[in-house]
Amino acid sequence: MSHTTDNGRYELLVDRSFVAQHYLTVPDPDPPEGTVHSHRFTVEVLLAGDSLGEYNYLVNINDLVALLDDLEQRYRDAVLNDLPEFEGENPSVERFARVISDRVHDGLSTDRLDSLTVRVWEDDLARASYETDI
């Protein structure tokens, strides 16, 4: 059966897990949030668009995997507070999602993408996401 119209949307999702540290810079944080502590972060990058390219890719998955490999190397075992992208900022899980989103957006060809969503889990209970239209 052939479809003459297609109102569907393609999505591509890749994730990564790594341990990184941070401390929150808010007034009177609950322990241990005000001191350096570790989280096993899981980062999920979801790309979406309504058309595929020449090879039926939304984006080349190898490019996205390589970009996430680079991000994992940057953040694995790092204290987020010490990195320039968090200078003067509270390194909340929400902020971390935005930082990763900006880096993914800058590192990929986005000509076929409509949206980019980054979800970051800091543990089994808490996650934040940042979604942007492209």
Where are the regions a protein language model picked out?
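Charge-rich, low-complexity N-terminal segments
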Residues: 1-134
